[in-house]
Amino acid sequence: MKYQQFVNSFTHPLQHEDHTPLLRLLSVHGKAAKGIADTVGAIDEKRLKNPGHTLPDLWDEIAVRHCACVYALYKTKDYTEAFNQQDKLLSLFYRWFVDQSSWVLPVLYMMLSDLRDLAEQADQTIHAETGKMPSLEICTRTVSKAFSLCATDRQFKGEESRRRGVYHTACLTIKCYFKVGKPNLCKNIIRAVVSDPKTPSVDTAPLPDQVTWHFYIGMLAFLNGEDKKADEELSWALKHCPADAKRNQELILTYLIPLRLLHGRFPSASLLSQHPRLELVFTPFINAIKNGDVEEYDRRLEWAQVRLVGMSVWLVVERAREGCLRSLFKKAWMASDKSTRVPIETFRLALKLHGVDVESDEVECMVANMIYRGYLKGYISHEKKMVVLGKTNPFPKMSTIAR
């Protein structure tokens, strides 16, 4: 595509508020972008100041910045320069965007996605050498600005309001915060969304944005130890996640499976088989809980520690070890003819048989903790070194235990 032809292509969609052609014209991917890089050539500052054509205000420079971006991306392979040009393009776009209605939101989403991709490409070498991500830091601020422009729209109402873009831009901002290691800032975005009565209900957002929003709310609740809320939000996200979105399902299950382990609720083998990476990590823990195999559980905790920490689920999986202890103690109780009085020594020997050799006092502490948490019904006779269990259902189902 020749330069003048490219420039003229903006006139009709801008006049008729048609976002579809703009998606093709302003994408940094695809044949159109590569064609511009091939035919337009380098963009110098002289052309930026005197583009030689007339488009609606600001669009002269927006068009030229896009040419500069794709030239750097495809011709000089200067990813930092490509990112910088895309970031400058968005700064110009925002100045025009504040006077527009929701018709242009798809274009905003695409340009923000492209900006994030370019930031990651620009930071690859720097991050490997220094651990820093300067372009992604800038990207995060630019994306956050887009959220603010959507959330503060007072010019348009209803379907035309830019507030329709709140959830998409909020989720993208949260994703960027996690990328740059600042998840603590996510609460500011969430508070801005939920505290503003003018924010549309999440139910009115496109389903993909709803799923992403519920996922992030659930993940943040998970990280904050709010198990019930996390389970509800992640379960909703999984239920409504498209069947063919396997990667997104895997992200949701990464947090949902550990939560379910706490309640003795296990994913089916067929579900796990669809996600081999999760199957490899979690199947041994599931089997260990079912069998009361504390030694195997501890071995797997050590084996998977680095991966579990990287997934941010280590602490919850470690807590789920209590379910494994419960299964073992229940087996010991059943081997004692389901007596309501079980010596501490019986539980100690059960642990020893599974490779956990501890003193009676420590076993007593374990039992006391399990009684406190609701895994056992009964009390400890310290003088007689005896656990006195309830006559009915001394080992409640894990799914009924309040967490």
Swiss-Prot record:
One of the GO biological process terms: post-transcriptional tethering of RNA polymerase II gene DNA at nuclear periphery
Gene3D superfamilies from the UniProt entry: Winged helix-like DNA-binding domain superfamily/Winged helix DNA-binding domain (1.10.10.10)
Family in the record: Belongs to the CSN12 family.
Gene Ontology CC annotations of this record: transcription export complex 2
Residues covered by the PCI domain: 211-394
A GO MF label: RNA binding
PANTHER family the record matches: PCI DOMAIN-CONTAINING PROTEIN 2, UNCHARACTERIZED PROTEASOME COMPONENT REGION PCI-CONTAINING
High-level lineage: Eukaryota, Fungi, Dikarya, Basidiomycota, Agaricomycotina
Protein name (record): Protein CSN12 homolog
Domain of life (superkingdom): Eukaryota
